[in-house]
Amino acid sequence: MPSRTIGNRQLKIENRQMIVGTGVDIAEVPRIAQAIARYGERFLRRIYTQAEMRYCDSKANRVERYAARFAAKEAAMKALGTGWNHGVRWVDCEVTRQPGGRPTMKFHGKAAEFASRLGTHNIALSLTHTAEQAFAQVILES
């Protein structure tokens, strides 16, 4: 196990993770509601995975949930450093839930390739939303 000396103290470093990318985004809930009303299933299938749609549609405040996931996908692309210009599709970034309900993210396709290049081994995701705004933060760790 690696160790490090600080002053006269020897510290053991068990799990050394480095942040390799961060991203944040805010989505306006009314704009997501308008997109769903205007484009319906076409919009939903382009942006969200089937599992994400099942989850959001099972909740009373479904549009807030969709907006939070939209913000998470935007934040993930910022963390990866790709934007949407390098063949990454919206559905390549999927918000899932850990046992106990904590949100996390899985990368697929091109997003997974970029995450691998960064040496990503852990994805920390935080979501929050109100009736008006949804916020997401993504931290990629090696």
Model-derived regions: residue spans:
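Core catalytic alpha/beta fold that binds nucleotide/phospho-ligands
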Residues: 17-142
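Short, basic, low-complexity termini and linkers enriched in Ser/Thr/Gly/Pro
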Residues: 1, 6-17
